[in-house]
């Protein structure tokens, strides 16, 4: 799974996704991409599940790029622990995905295969998405 090698701080603020994405809104590598419509927090496990689903559908042909990286540590308190006594320990990593952000890109397969692969990847993600093409 994706995780940062080094971090400046162990814990991060919860934060919100408030604005549209300014960078990463156009296709840079592939001919087909998966663009977010909602703003949401996507975990490293969800990204990995989407990657596996897409590569399995493509039968390991072509190329897949992941354009988001989970660098936000999400902390959680253990089960049945009372409120207070500080913030919990980091459990997993996530990324805040803004509306308009390209998350996955595909190149080197036919359009119907690419669309099917991106639909399968989209089903694994908590954000609403749409498929974009390079010639649009």
UniProtKB/Swiss-Prot annotation:
Domain of life: Bacteria
Keywords carried by this UniProt record: Ribonucleoprotein, Ribosomal protein, RNA-binding, rRNA-binding, tRNA-binding
Keyword Ribonucleoprotein listed: yes
Family the entry assigns: Belongs to the universal ribosomal protein uL16 family.
InterPro entries recorded: Ribosomal_uL16 (IPR047873), Ribosomal_uL16_bact-type (IPR000114), Ribosomal_uL16_CS (IPR020798), Ribosomal_uL16_dom (IPR016180), Ribosomal_uL16_sf (IPR036920)
Assembly: Part of the 50S ribosomal subunit.
Function comment: Binds 23S rRNA and is also seen to make contacts with the A and possibly P site tRNAs.
Gene3D superfamilies listed in its UniProt record: Ribosomal protein L10e/L16
Ranges in coiled-coil conformation: none
Gene it is expressed from: rplP
An example Gene Ontology CC term for this record: cytosolic large ribosomal subunit
Protein known as: Large ribosomal subunit protein uL16
Pfam family, one: Ribosomal_L16
Biological processes per GO annotation: translation
GO molecular-function terms, A-Z: rRNA binding; structural constituent of ribosome; tRNA binding
């Amino acid at each position: 799974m994706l995780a940062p090698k080094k971090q400046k701080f162990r814990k991060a603020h919860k934060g919100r996704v408030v604005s549209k994405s300014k960078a990463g809104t156009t296709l840079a590598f592939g001919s087909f991409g998966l663009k977010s419509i909602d703003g949401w927090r996507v975990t490293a496990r969800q990204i990995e599940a989407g990657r596996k689903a897409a590569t399995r559908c493509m039968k390991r042909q072509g190329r897949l790029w992941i354009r988001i990286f989970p660098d936000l540590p999400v902390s959680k308190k253990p089960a049945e622990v009372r409120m207070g006594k500080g913030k919990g320990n980091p459990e997993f990593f996530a990324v805040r995905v803004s509306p308009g952000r390209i998350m996955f890109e595909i190149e080197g397969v036919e359009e119907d295969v690419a669309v099917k692969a991106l639909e399968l990847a989209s089903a694994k993600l908590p954000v609403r998405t749409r498929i974009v093409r390079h010639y649009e």
